Amino acid sequence: MKRKMLWSSLIVILFVCILFLNKIVDFIINVEWYKEVGYLTVYFTKLIAICKLMIPLFIIIYISIVLYWRSLRLSIIKYRRAFEVNNDKVKNEKRIFIIVNLIVSFLFSYAFAATYWYRILQFNNSVPFNIKDPILNLDVSFYIFKLPLIQSLHSMILSLIIFLGLITLVTYFTLSVKDKVIWRNFKKDSGKIDILNSGITRFAGKQLAVLAALVMICVSIGYILKCIGLVYSQKGVTFGAGYTDAHVSLLLYKIIAAASIISAVIIFISILVSKVKPIIVSITVIVALILIKSLSYTVVQNFIVKSNQKTLEQPYIKYNIDYTRKAFNIENIDANPFQVKDNLTSQDIDNNMDTINNIRINSFEPTLEFYNQVQIIRYYYKFNNIDVDRYNINGKFNQIFIGTREINTKAIDPNTWQNRHLIYTHGYGIVMNKVNSVTSEGQPNFVIKDMPPQNSTDIKLDNARIYFGEKTDDYAIVDTKLKEFDYPKGSENATNNYDGSAGIKLGFINRILFAINQKDINFLLSRDILKESKILINRSIKDRVSKIAPFLNYDSDPYIVMSGGKLYWILDGYTVSDRYPFAQPQNNLNYIRNSVKVTVDAENGNVNFYIMDKSDPIVQSYAKIFPDLFKDINKLPSDIVQHFKYPKDLFNIQCSVLGKYHVTDPGVFYSGEDLWEVAKNQKQVSGEKYSMESSYMVMKLPNEQKEEMILLQYFNMRDKDNMVALFGARMDGENYGKMVLYKFPAEKTVYSPYLFKQKLNQDTTISSQLSLWNKDGSEVQFGDTIIVPINQSLVYVEPMYLRASGKEGIPEMKRVIVSYSDKMVLAESIDDALQQIFSYKQDYNQENSNESQIETPSYDINAEKLKEAKSLYEQALEAQKNGDWSKYGENIKKLGDIIDSLQK
């Protein structure tokens, strides 16, 4: 018997292992990977939290079901007139019940714990915001850290009660059918079964009444949560509680909650004394109160609030404005008037040459296209993206484009397992060009290019290998018998053996595990894998980072920087919530902070998390939960810190919010008379409108002393093309995260990018020139429209590209259109355009002031010399025709003497 039990147990264990084999393998690999990257404690924090939440939940649910099932059995015995005892049947039922209960309890507890593990951690590690909501006077931390767990527990308990109710109903109907079959409660005088008066029916009624009492307690808690949830109401003028919510809904929710508790007590007592009427009355009262609440809300809203909405809703609109601006971190914007004057001089241009010299004439899309046409070197490389940054290059502060040459394993031909995973393991090199400079052909002027990198800057770059990248999705096996391809080198290829620290050792056991994990037998069959070989997994930057810290949100655009001769990725991490009271949601969230900066070593894959915003309570909570996760940002090398950028994803959300919430006066906000939107533009003069993307610029802000990088966006009046403001985020040094807003005069028409395009189209000289270029197999394309504030003036810049028609045409920057005031110039460079705009204005004034001093004899002498030069030229031509080369040379010499005298 014991041997039989042993074999049965072994079979069950083997079956479970096979059933959960993939989960077991994933767990072992995860443990090895988290250990390799140095965040094993973070992984186990999650697992321990799940266990801490799951085990007590499992016990509570299991015991609750056991107790309830026992009460069912006792009730069945009590209310059935006869009860047959079959010991074998009872044992079988007990075994089945235990198995079912274990499964149900496990599923309930695991599903809840796996989904909400971080909520209990946040509940226990909450950090106060020191901001209270204006309705219930609760700290914002309650809504963000505690309320979600309370709501989740409430939903789970209610689901459990409903589940027990279903068990009761199933039991009732099963026994009722059984009674009918065996003719229990048969009335001899009628020959019918009296189901309604049967013991089974009375049993079911009492069991369901007990559950109804528990449901009423849940209803009471639910209405208390509804009171709290009024800060998220969407019934008023703005998000958050309105007048009717605060004066009607809040009161009646409290009354319903209290009445539900009383009803629960009445129902419970009525069960003990076998009274049905009080139960019906109490439930009827609750239903009536709910109907009264709905009716009262409708009456007050339509007959009191609607006709006096602006006055009654004003304080609640103010709450919405204030809390939305706090939640999206736009309450401390440095707003200044910008007069838009037309008084720039050449001296102003000279004083702002560092701004002028960093205006971007290389536009993003054509530059990325050019990178992928000219600098991939081989077809299996790809530039997935280019990033804007700033570097001190040879002593000058320059805005640049930089791109990484990543391996594109899908393009490898032949795409064999060895090629894809053992040979072509990494990308190689970066390409950099200044945004303000092009070659004579109109192509980006590279300062770092080719393979191996040809570097004309003073920026150190010793290791250009990219094992971890934006789109490096495949695993790589390194330190094998095969040499890794490094980069093409003439007729041969340079090779490399990985000497980084990343990777999990591929011993025999791990080869088996990865063969199962990747569903690939090559791990076991390959003769190239050695005992010291390692596998690099999770090589995509975003996947790697989010696997370590999945509770953070991440920016969509990691960017590469050079530091200490190596390459590092920087990725912005956000703490977000959709639970901030009264704050208007945007993109399914209503609180966001750029609280974390993440760096990833492009060769070793080392990941480091740094707290950027120590004032954020959410990141403080995470730091308490995961004490080994975050590092002090002061320990980060300064040459990485100086490349921190304000992230576009966050800025774009703030721009969307600012379009409405730049208004702080509730009356003006209610009237909707000052709404903004992101400015529109066109790719082509006659093309469709599209919303402008925010752009990084190096410039000197008004009243500032030096240039810095700014993330800038332009605003129009909503549904209009008149520009009303410039909005920017600073990011250099101590100014990181500071916001600036420059408002234009309301009475003045300021050209938006779209109006600038229309003005360009109406310029006869420029439009005719564009028409000439835009034919005969050529196509004119416009780059990024840049509007540069200088002092209190605006300068508009539009690069113009020319490309041969067809897919293989390379875009070349041929001209720059510059507009200032009522002047618009088409030139080969910004310098030429500005020279034309400001020099002819200056020369005109000089001519006017010196007009009376011009001497006529001087003019006559020059005219006589020109006449003589013409005569000599004609004589030289005549001598040439006659073959008199002596006379020809004499005339040409005299002509040269006259030209020399005219130049003096």
UniProtKB/Swiss-Prot annotation:
GO terms for cellular component: extracellular region; plasma membrane. The chain crosses the membrane at residues 9-29, 47-67, 96-116, 157-177, 208-228, 253-273, 279-299. The keyword Transmembrane applies. The keyword Cell membrane applies. It is a multi-pass membrane protein. It is found in: Cell membrane. Pfam families: UPF0182 (PF03699). InterPro entries: UPF0182 (IPR005372). Keywords: Cell membrane, Membrane, Transmembrane, Transmembrane helix. HAMAP family: UPF0182. Belongs to the UPF0182 family. PANTHER family: UPF0182 PROTEIN SLL1060. This is UPF0182 protein CKL_0015. It comes from Clostridium kluyveri (strain ATCC 8527 / DSM 555 / NBRC 12016 / NCIMB 10680 / K1).
